[in-house]
A protein has these predicted regions:
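N-terminal export signals
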Residues: 5-25
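Aromatic-rich peripheral "rim/lid" segments of glycoside hydrolase catalytic domains that contact
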Residues: 296-357
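Surface-exposed, active-site-proximal loop segments in enzymatic domains
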Residues: 53, 82-99, 124-142, 330-336
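Acidic/histidine-rich helix-loop elements
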Residues: 46-60, 89-93, 136-139, 235-263
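N-terminal carbohydrate-binding accessory modules
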Residues: 27-75, 276
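An active-site-proximal structural segment forming one wall of the substrate-binding cleft
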Residues: 65-73, 94-120, 132-166, 186, ...
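Active-site region of glycoside hydrolase catalytic domains
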Residues: 141-260, 269-292, 313-319
């Protein structure tokens, strides 16, 4: 599908599927977003393309967009695996039916006033999660060429959609590679995007899995994304993928021997370095954060309140991982929560009100 066809389809859909504008109490306002100053977008990660399903991935759910908008949120980050729409034997061969699911999400975002943030969670040559990619994005030209090809395709496909409705988040949580290596890769991807759409808002995750700002990217005219998972003893208690089963039950503030990790620790170690980056003309957003469902609920909410207060003070938006699931406000399966029945889901009302506060 070319860009003109896509824009025609979404325009036609808008006639038949238009919904009344939803008053949005949390919606970011002010001037159009720029890489140097992002709106305080707030919302959730939606996981329909997070990993490739053997039987095929479903489209994004309109009910998610309606719920977010009704609650007053205005941001959806879509962490995606390139394998959802690519032949694993030919990374440059794209499957149009899967890509149309992304088109559908873009249109749902338009209808419900939700900004769409596309993210390659699994890119050709890199993913923070297993299994390991067959090539290494940081070393292999073939992987970098394929990754640039995918971003160029998205840039061309969605050219004309303004950046207040859509942004690109290049790579999820790059590891502790040398900064020069990361800058080289990001520069290549940004160049591929701008050859197709010079106006697209682009965001890069911080290094060391999103935790560290990257000053070497400040001259590229892109924003950066941080994380809200520190300390992981709180956010990932009993999470098997980080070997959290053996950790002691957390408190907040967290006691680590003679050290206490609290709100002021977060301010000093996780907020101030990024505020210093902002002084270089780089906008900041928290692309992921959340607390796994084994952490006691009272501890979870206390941790969330402190992070939210710090981000509000900094003027940063955020996207909770996730809307539905073990970190989310819906269907999280916590044992210490009295859930509310809500549109076919189990709602953690107390967490929702903390997020909306």
């Amino acid at each position: 599908m070319n860009r003109r066809d896509f824009l025609n389809i979404t325009a036609t859909a808008a006639v038949g599927l238009a919904v009344a504008p939803v008053p949005n109490a949390l919606a970011a306002d002010g001037p159009s977003p720029t890489a140097s100053h992002l709106p305080r977008w707030r919302g959730f990660n939606l996981l329909e393309k997070f990993t490739k399903w053997d039987k095929g991935n479903p489209p994004f759910q309109e009910s998610d967009f309606a719920i977010m908008a009704d609650w007053g949120f205005d941001f959806a980050r879509l962490p995606m695996s390139y394998l959802c729409w690519t032949d694993p034997e030919d990374w440059l061969k794209l499957r149009e039916p899967e890509l149309k699911h992304l088109d559908g999400a873009v249109e749902l975002g338009r209808q419900h006033g939700i900004h769409i943030n596309l993210n390659l969670h699994r890119a050709p040559g890199y993913c923070v999660n297993p299994p390991k990619e067959p090539l290494d994005l940081w070393k292999d030209e073939k992987a970098l060429e394929a990754c640039a090809f995918h971003w160029a395709h998205f840039a061309k496909r969605y050219k004309g959609i303004p950046s207040d409705r859509m942004s690109f988040d290049l790579l999820n949580e790059p590891p502790a590679v040398p900064e020069a290596t990361y800058v080289r890769v990001v520069t290549r991807l940004v160049e591929a995007i701008r050859q197709e759409d010079p106006k697209r808002l682009v965001i890069a995750d911080g290094l060391k899995w999103g935790g560290d700002p990257v000053r070497g990217l400040a001259g590229l005219g892109i924003a950066q994304s941080t994380r809200g998972y520190y300390p992981m003893q709180v956010t990932h208690y009993k999470a098997s993928w980080v070997r959290g089963e053996s950790w002691p039950e957390p408190t907040w503030p967290l006691k680590e021997g003679a050290k206490t990790v609290d709100k002021e620790t977060l301010r000093k170690e996780r907020i101030q370095p990024w505020r210093d980056l902002e002084k270089q003309g780089v906008g900041v957003h928290v692309g992921e954060w959340g607390v796994y469902n084994h952490t006691p609920h009272a501890v979870t909410l206390a941790f969330m309140r402190d992070n939210l207060a710090l981000w509000r003070e900094a003027g940063w938006g955020w996207a909770l991982w996730n809307l539905r699931g073990s970190f989310g406000v819906l269907d999280s399966q916590r044992e210490d929560v009295k859930y509310e029945d809500f549109r076919g889901h189990k709602l953690d009302r107390e967490m929702l009100e903390v997020l909306r506060g």
